[in-house]
């Protein structure tokens, strides 16, 4: 990823402390029936989480204009949470990658915060973009 535009989406630079991306990582997104778009950037050799599992991740989230609204990389600390307690796009998307893997998600508003947004950082009806490294599955 770089600070360029693809399909009118601005991508911020890859966080400096992010792990490596597979050399054969896809350049194009795949889509699920729900409308979630994703690219598995590093497959990961471990277990895929289910909605009842707790995951530990590093992530960066940005809007379609490239503005980063949240980043565990920038805070220098990963985060753990039950996969059932996050937006639908995360719950669905994280099941597509194994422990140790990295995925890029493009989450439509109906799988994110919808019409309400999330405070000042995420406006209503925003498509959200995430780079997520799945560190552990518990």
Identify the function of each model-found stretch:
Residues 1-138:
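Cross-family detector of peptidyl-prolyl cis-trans isomerase
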């Amino acid at each position: 990823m770089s600070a360029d535009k693809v399909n009118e989406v601005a991508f911020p630079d890859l966080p400096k402390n992010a792990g490596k991306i597979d050399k054969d990582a896809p350049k194009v997104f795949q889509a699920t029936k729900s409308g979630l778009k994703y690219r598995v950037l590093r497959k990961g050799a471990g277990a895929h989480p289910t909605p009842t599992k707790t995951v530990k991740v590093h992530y960066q989230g940005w809007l379609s204009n490239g503005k980063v609204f949240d980043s565990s990389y920038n805070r220098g600390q990963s985060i753990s949470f039950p996969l059932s307690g996050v937006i639908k796009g995360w719950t669905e998307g994280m099941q597509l990658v194994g422990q140790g893997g990295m995925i890029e998600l493009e989450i439509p508003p109906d799988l994110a915060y919808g019409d309400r947004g999330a405070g000042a950082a995420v406006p209503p009806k925003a498509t959200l973009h995430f780079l997520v490294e799945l560190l552990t599955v518990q």
